[in-house]
Design a protein with these regions (language model features):
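Acidic, low-complexity intrinsically disordered segments
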Residues: 1-3
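Metal-dependent catalytic cores of enzymes that make or break cyclic nucleotides
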Residues: 6, 10, 20, 27-247, ...
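Boundary/linker elements of alpha-helical solenoid repeat scaffolds
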Residues: 14-17
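Charged substrate- and nucleic-acid-binding regions of tRNA-handling and nucleotidyl-transfer enzymes
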Residues: 249-299
Length: 301
């Protein structure tokens, strides 16, 4: 009996080591893939992938999905456009209704390309299925398979809404380095500059809920988007040393390393996990020692 217990303990330790190795490999792969996705984001004000990932996860939690589902949706949202890597610029900055037939034909391939890239990597099988469906619409008018209603994965239905919103409000026909005139100087200028696009996007979601998009998902997301704008209105822009940056603050500019990797994107919320990395990048001269963030007006000294 003692030998059996010892063998069970050895097997448990081996499984734990294997699980740890698999988890480490998964996150290393995810880090590499998310960096690759950055090459598709030249025509966005801020990081499209990071925004869609953050808000899709928030939305999934609000809708009551379990922890594992939320995690898979967050990863799928981060990588949902990986199939666009290598696409012509016209497939990156144009909206689908602006594309020529040959441009749209290429664009429509990206969910399948994304699935093919990911499906054979350990831990990405369900994630690749969500990515494959993120352009499906509940009335069957989406692609690649014209799925309807409950045929669509809940995660894909969530990403579809957030993806539409961020494209509608933050996509631009100019590359990031040409967008200096859009830099946030104060919260009111940001709200004014995005007011028209925000109102148009919210109106479209309201009109198309229950038709193109899941009704519950749209209603929950619209509440999030409205609240986010209210939060911004109570903040001010301040340049702070990286060691004074706190979770919950919001980046006002995009920050890149010397080799072009996006470290923090405009509009992205600071998380606790970012703090150490920001300090290290600043110490190594990859980002400024002081960065622009939105802070609560009451916290300004």
């Amino acid at each position: 009996m003692e030998d059996v217990n010892q063998r069970v303990s050895e097997l448990e330790r081996m499984v734990n080591r294997l699980s740890g190795d698999l988890a480490e490999n998964f996150f290393q792969t995810l880090q590499i893939l998310s960096s690759i996705v950055g090459f598709t984001e030249r025509f966005y004000d801020g990081s499209h992938a990071k925004y869609v990932s953050e808000k899709s996860a928030e939305l999934a939690r609000i809708l009551g999905l379990g922890r594992e589902d939320v995690f898979q949706i967050k990863v799928a949202a981060l990588l949902h456009d990986i199939g666009k890597v290598g696409f012509y610029d016209s497939a990156l900055y144009k909206y689908p209704n602006e594309m020529r037939p040959n441009e749209f034909a290429q664009y429509a391939l990206h969910p399948e390309i994304g699935r093919q890239i990911l499906k054979n990597h350990h831990g990405f099988d369900n994630i690749s299925d969500i990515i494959y469906q993120h352009h499906e619409k509940i009335d069957g008018s989406g692609f690649p398979n014209g799925l309807k209603g409950n045929q669509i994965h809940p995660g894909a239905a969530i990403i579809s809404v957030v993806n539409y919103y961020h494209n509608a409000v933050y996509k631009t026909k100019r590359e990031r380095d040409e967008q200096s005139e859009n830099k946030i100087t104060n919260t009111q200028s940001y709200l004014n500059n995005t007011k028209e696009k925000f109102s148009s996007a919210m109106s479209f979601l309201q009109q198309k809920k229950g038709i193109l998009f899941d009704r519950k998902v749209v209603e929950a997301f619209m509440a999030i988007a409205e609240m986010d704008r209210k939060k911004v209105s109570g903040k001010v822009v301040q340049r702070l040393p990286v060691n004074l940056i706190k979770p919950g603050m919001m980046f006002v500019e995009n920050y890149y390393t010397s080799f072009g990797l996006l470290i923090a994107s405009r509009g992205e919320s600071v998380t606790k996990e970012m703090l150490g990395a920001l300090v290290r990048f600043a110490e190594n001269g990859e980002i400024p020692h002081k960065i622009l963030v939105l802070v609560e007006a009451d916290d300004v000294k």
